[in-house]
Amino acid sequence: MNLRAIAVTFATFAGANAAVIDHDQVIPFAQPMPNTTLQSVAIQFKPQIYINNGCHPYPAVDADGNTSGGLKPTGSQSAGCKGSGYGSQIYGRAVEYEGVYAFMYSWYMPKDETLDGQGHRHDWENCVVWLDSLDRPSIVALSASYHSTYNYYYPPSSSYLDGNSAKIQYSTSWIVLDHSLSATSTAGEIQDLIMWDQLTDAARTALEDTDFGSANVPFKEDNFIAKLAKAYYV
């Protein structure tokens, strides 16, 4: 059996034994050393997130492919989800798109609640940082997920940037609307970054296959390019 076959067999076995576990028991990936230019640039431009209201980000999947069971929307908007004791996670995926470079950064929250009992289990949000090159990159635009579309910042105000780090806000201001992202002048928190190609096979498979209910993993194969098309700022 060759190495690829062994890897596939192991990933299949690991995925078959993965489970849905409590949201506060998912252990995040430590941010690895970059091995590619895309990985290096992704770290350089990693955004920060300010939680205006609602849950703080949590890891969605661990190295063995176990995924978060999320939280039922009860109590306050941040009840039970003010931060994981194991640390949190930001997920990344990057590609050249329409002559520029799209770096999608995604966060997972265990629930999306507006009022007690109103909302849904699980939330995925993302922003796209658009760069002009990889050699001497600079930010051309920002896109922040807003329900089924995006908020666009082209070019972004300097107040929305902390050096190379975009400042992103997670909030809702309407009882009937779920949480979404926008640019902000307020500094936020950062998490360890794990890129799509740095995840274990078991973790990638879990993110591809797990049903997160009303929330969709934006960077998985079926969604990534379609999301970039919506996020594109031109």
From Swiss-Prot:
This is NLP effector protein Pc576423. Disulfide bonds: none annotated. Its main location: secreted. It comes from Phytophthora capsici. Belongs to the Necrosis inducing protein (NPP1) family. A motif (Hepta-peptide GHRHDWE motif) lies at residues 119-125. InterPro entries: NPP1. Secreted effector that contributes strongly to virulence during infection by P.capsici.
